[in-house]
Amino acid sequence: ENVYKHATDIAGIRTLKIYGVYDPNVVKAAVYMVKSDAPENTVLLAATRMHGKPTLTIFVSDDLVKKGMNAGKMIREAAKAIQGGGGGQPGFAQAGGRNEEGISLAMEKMEALIAAEA
């Protein structure tokens, strides 16, 4: 099945979202799958929790990285919503935290950051 048909549009950027209770390893596998064949102009945002631990993930396609979008910077800002921290590279970043109730706000922050960087 083509996962991209489930994408939403944020400020003209194709955006895949994973939200809810998911094992972080499943999210990481999804990122690698998307990275292997991601069309241009694509991001993946994940705000998940498992066993009381929230995790955020951002993947940014290479063309958007070349335009200045930086997953590492965005994840540090969004991680505040889950009382956590994280980092990574311009194309892929993850964060963990202590406040699983904050994943909804974290997703909203990530969406706003994508729109601001578009």
PLM segments and residue spans:
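Hard-cation-handling environments
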Residues: 1-11, 36
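Glycine-rich, acidic loop segments that terminate in or are immediately followed by a histidine
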Residues: 13-118
